[in-house]
C-alpha cells in the first residue's frame, strides 16, 4: 500500500535551495573569469589561435 512521504521541513528546503544557488553562482563566476582571461590573452590553460 502506498504511503505518502513526510513533508520536507522548510529549513531543510531552504538549505538545499541555497546550496543549489551557490553552486550556480560559483560556476558562473568561473565561466566569467575564464572568458575574461581568454579575451585579454592572459589564459594559461587555453591556447587560442589568433587570426592575423
Curated annotation (Swiss-Prot):
GO cellular component terms, semicolon-separated: chloroplast; large ribosomal subunit
GO MF annotations in UniProt: structural constituent of ribosome
InterPro entries found in the cross-reference section: Ribosomal_bL32 (IPR002677), Ribosomal_bL32_plant/cyanobact (IPR044958), Ribosomal_zn-bd (IPR011332)
Keywords assigned: Chloroplast, Plastid, Ribonucleoprotein, Ribosomal protein
Localization of this protein: Plastid, Chloroplast
Domain of life: Eukaryota
SUPFAM superfamilies: Zn-binding ribosomal proteins (SSF57829)
GO term, biological process aspect, one: translation
Entries under HAMAP family matching the protein: Ribosomal_bL32 (MF_00340)
Protein family per UniProt: Belongs to the bacterial ribosomal protein bL32 family.
Protein name: Large ribosomal subunit protein bL32c
Amino acid at each position: 500500500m502506498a504511503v505518502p512521504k513526510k513533508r520536507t521541513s522548510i529549513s531543510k528546503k531552504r538549505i538545499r535551495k541555497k546550496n543549489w544557488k551557490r553552486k550556480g553562482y560559483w560556476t558562473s563566476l568561473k565561466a566569467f573569469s575564464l572568458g575574461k582571461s581568454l579575451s585579454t590573452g592572459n589564459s594559461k590553460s587555453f591556447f587560442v589561435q589568433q587570426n592575423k
